[in-house]
Amino acid sequence: WSKIDIDVCGPLALQRCLIVYPWTQRYFGSFGDLSTVAAIMGNPKVAQHGVVALTGLRTALDHMDEIKSTYAALSVLHSEKLHVDPDNFRLLCECLTIVIAGKMGKKLSPDMQAAWQKYLCAVVSALGRQYH
């Protein structure tokens, strides 16, 4: 995590997710104009939520032995109030991995990527737990 700039990678990951998977935009109706790539890339609410999402993702590091309970409230919020399709967590994590790979280049070794993917899978599972 020390190599990840949350203020840069968070917005880039969410922007990429909204552009590559446009159906994910339906959960962000209150964010204003998301009609074009330029609108998404310049939207301060998208950028802010990207930081929030990555900050939340970072929380799991401090609670590795209790990831599911750490994300229990967020799981309930996203499933029962926001009605977010849990597959969107996976899509966002895929976009985040691409952003991080772009930033780190060759420094992101296969072993590091494997550990990163395992971490993300645990968090995505915890966030989707309420849906099961």
UniProtKB/Swiss-Prot annotation:
Is Repeat given among the entry's keywords?
A: no
Q: Name one Pfam family in it.
A: Globin
| Family matches, as InterPro entries | Globin (IPR000971), Globin-like_sf (IPR009050), Globin/Proto (IPR012292), Hemoglobin_b (IPR002337), Hemoglobin_oxygen_transport (IPR050056)
GO cellular component term of the entry, any: hemoglobin complex
Q: What CDD domains does its record include?
A: Hb-beta-like
Tissues of expression: Red blood cells.
Note the superkingdom of the native organism. Eukaryota
**Where is heme b annotated to bind?**
49, 78
Keyword annotations for this protein, in alphabetical order, are: Heme, Iron, Metal-binding, Oxygen transport, Transport
Q: Which GO terms describe its molecular function?
A: haptoglobin binding; heme binding; metal ion binding; organic acid binding; oxygen binding; oxygen carrier activity; peroxidase activity
Residue span(s) of domain Globin: 1-132
One Gene Ontology biological process: hydrogen peroxide catabolic process
The family note in this entry says: Belongs to the globin family.
Role according to the record: Involved in oxygen transport from gills to the various peripheral tissues.
Quaternary structure, per UniProt, is: Hb 1 is a heterotetramer of two alpha-1 and two beta-1 chains. Hb 2 is a heterotetramer of two alpha-2 and two beta-1 chains.
Please identify the protein, giving its name as recorded.
Hemoglobin subunit beta-1
Source organism (scientific name): Arctogadus glacialis
